[in-house]
């Protein structure tokens, strides 16, 4: 809380985090049995923000034990009692929203405008599931002869969350809120690149009144995540991240037959038809590619534009992309900050170089950028990039770049573009811009993706389910559907008469 309270006077390049970043048993704890210390960098300056010490096996076990003990109390509470505590947590986040958002910016690199939206989305998620908690119930089924059955919706136990670095606080809330609403306990592991804000969420839940040890945080990388996946007392793992890591999580969790939710990568198509409202389509394409420096799993990075409107579309998109203000993420006029790390920046720039080799044309951006402010000279900035002259077989069109790079491709017919849009192993999101209501719903029905946007893009309301098709994962986050992934159904069969026996 002291770190959060100091945020009003904080500026880019001024914050050093010395607090312990693990949390179990209702308090912050310093790692002792992790292998090595890893530096955590501030994306805007390239400066070391803090040191992350990963948790080892003994510490992960302590966190799980803490969760197990609290689960015995929380799972016995009525839904309305759980709801009151969760609503108080949402209120505290709302109250501290501005300060948490500033710390999120310093750790993650996204702009303050986006971070404020993320923190709002976090408390809204908790508030939503607080409302859902008292409604969770089973079903009564009448059977012949006066017998009957009923179902009980019961929690799973200890749920583990393995988080991504692009939305550290919000994704932590997405994992915790439905789990807690259903009566579970939680142990989550933030990304080693963004370890700072997740622990604040755990503190807030305890301040709000959850049983001590209900929400726990273990820091670390792949080894710590592996310990959670293999732990015999973890009932479920929810993972957000890349496809290769998701496969490993699934494989490790299978050894103890855990419930698994995977929210993985994407290479989402955005289809822009000639009858669209061009202004909205341009706005949608920019939102689909440049939020959070392009580091968003749902990004519509394959922008298919009907040939007749390609010149007008490119002219407007390039003009607006060039006008994007890149710089200090804590300034309200900034629209793009630094990428998460130097390796990520180099990787994205490498994709642009490869695209040029394969014949794509860079219409703007795609280069390292040094803002005028001297304190930002070592930050991980690049200019947002628009590529045209792209083909479906190019690396930039097939692989997830995870940076501010838009690939634009022409198409002629609806049938053709649907076939091309679905020709991918991913299936997280998709979008269509058209004024033809029949086409809009026809295209949405035929796109192979967990989410399809019609005449919009890049919104994820907590009320609606979110998740992927194909290799973008399975399970759902947000919405009522998530209850099915954080609970289990018990069937109880009751005979009111004599037992009908063959013996």
UniProtKB/Swiss-Prot annotation:
GO terms, molecular function: 4-trimethylammoniobutyraldehyde dehydrogenase activity; aldehyde dehydrogenase (NAD+) activity
Q: Which InterPro entries match?
A: Ald_DH/histidinol_DH (IPR016161), Ald_DH_C (IPR016163), Ald_DH_CS_CYS (IPR016160), Ald_DH_CS_GLU (IPR029510), Ald_DH_N (IPR016162), Aldehyde_DH_dom (IPR015590)
EC numbers for this chain: 1.2.1.47, 1.2.1.3
Cited SUPFAM superfamilies: ALDH-like
Named in its record, the pathway it takes part in is: Amine and polyamine biosynthesis; carnitine biosynthesis
* Keyword Membrane assigned: no
Where is it chiefly localized? cytoplasm
> What residues form the catalytic site here?
263, 297
Q: Which GO terms describe its cellular component?
A: cytosol
List the residues marked with site Transition state stabilizer. Answer: 166
Q: Where in the cell is it found?
A: Cytoplasm, Cytosol
What quaternary structure, including any partners, is listed in this protein's UniProt entry? Homotetramer.
Q: Know the name of this protein?
A: 4-trimethylaminobutyraldehyde dehydrogenase
Query: Whose protein is this, by species?
Result: Gadus morhua subsp. callarias
What taxonomic ancestry is recorded? Eukaryota, Metazoa, Chordata, Craniata, Vertebrata
């Amino acid at each position: 809380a002291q770190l959060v309270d100091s945020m009003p006077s904080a500026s880019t390049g001024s914050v050093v985090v010395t607090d312990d970043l693990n949390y179990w048993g209702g308090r912050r704890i310093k790692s002792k049995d992790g292998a090595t210390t890893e530096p955590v960098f501030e994306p805007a300056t390239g400066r070391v923000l803090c040191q992350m010490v990963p948790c080892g096996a003994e510490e992960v076990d302590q966190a799980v034990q803490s969760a197990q003990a609290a689960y015995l109390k929380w799972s016995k509470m009525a839904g309305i009692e759980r709801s009151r505590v969760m609503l108080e947590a949402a209120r505290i986040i709302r109250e501290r929203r501005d300060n948490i958002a500033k710390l999120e910016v310093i750790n993650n690199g996204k702009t303050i405008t986006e971070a404020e939206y993320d923190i709002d989305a976090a408390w809204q998620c908790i508030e939503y599931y607080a409302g859902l908690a008292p409604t969770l119930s089973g079903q009564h089924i009448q059977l012949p002869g006066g017998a009957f059955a009923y179902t009980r919706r019961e929690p799973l136990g200890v749920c583990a969350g393995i988080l991504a670095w692009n939305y550290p606080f919000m994704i932590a809330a997405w994992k915790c809120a439905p789990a807690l609403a259903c009566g579970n306990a939680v142990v989550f592991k933030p990304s080693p690149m963004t370890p700072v804000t997740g622990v604040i969420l755990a503190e807030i839940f305890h301040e709000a009144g959850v049983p001590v040890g209900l929400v726990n945080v273990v820091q670390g990388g792949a080894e710590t995540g592996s310990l959670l996946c293999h732990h015999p007392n973890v009932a479920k793992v929810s993972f957000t991240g890349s496809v290769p890591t998701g496969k490993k999580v699934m494989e490790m969790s299978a050894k103890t037959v855990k419930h698994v939710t995977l929210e993985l990568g994407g290479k989402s198509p955005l289809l822009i038809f000639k009858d669209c409202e061009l202004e909205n389509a341009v706005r949608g394409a920019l939102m689909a590619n440049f939020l959070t420096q392009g580091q968003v799993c749902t990004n519509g990075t394959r922008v298919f534009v009907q040939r007749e409107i390609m010149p007008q579309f490119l002219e407007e998109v390039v003009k607006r992309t060039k006008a994007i203000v890149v710089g200090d993420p804590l300034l309200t006029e900034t629209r793009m900050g630094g990428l998460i790390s130097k390796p990520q920046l180099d990787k994205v720039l490498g994709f642009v170089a490869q695209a040029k080799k394969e014949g794509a044309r860079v219409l703007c951006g795609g280069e390292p950028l040094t803002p005028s402010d001297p304190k930002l000279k070592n930050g991980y900035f690049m200019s947002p990039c628009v590529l045209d002259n792209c083909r479906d077989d190019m690396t930039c069109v097939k692989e997830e770049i995870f940076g501010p790079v838009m690939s634009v491709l022409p198409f002629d017919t609806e049938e053709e573009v649907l076939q091309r849009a679905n020709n991918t192993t991913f299936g997280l999101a998709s979008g269509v811009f058209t004024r033809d209501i029949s086409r809009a719903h026809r295209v949405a029905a035929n796109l192979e993706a967990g989410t399809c946007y019609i005449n919009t893009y890049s919104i994820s309301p907590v009320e609606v389910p979110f998740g992927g098709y194909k290799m973008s994962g399975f399970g759902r986050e947000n919405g009522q559907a998530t209850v099915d992934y954080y609970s289990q159904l018990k069937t109880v069969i009751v005979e009111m008469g004599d037992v009908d026996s063959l013996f």
